[in-house]
């Protein structure tokens, strides 16, 4: 993997982390249960994406 590609993946992990933090902070101020459930689902999706990116980077470092 080139340095440019590595930087892209590191940025993507950072972006996913930021989105997760924003969604978690947003949850603290929402009282509508439908909206809360939607935000929790979205947080879960972004957590999965972040883990996939991290796992991919780990696999690349082992090669």
Language-model segments: residues:
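His/Met- and acidic-residue-enriched segments that coordinate or traffic transition-metal cofactors
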Residues: 1-63
């Amino acid at each position: 993997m080139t340095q440019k590609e590595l930087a892209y993946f590191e940025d993507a992990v950072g972006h996913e982390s930021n989105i997760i933090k924003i969604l978690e902070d947003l949850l603290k101020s929402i009282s509508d249960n439908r909206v809360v459930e939607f935000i929790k689902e979205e947080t879960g999706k972004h957590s999965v994406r972040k883990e996939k990116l991290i796992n991919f980077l780990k696999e690349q470092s082992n090669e």
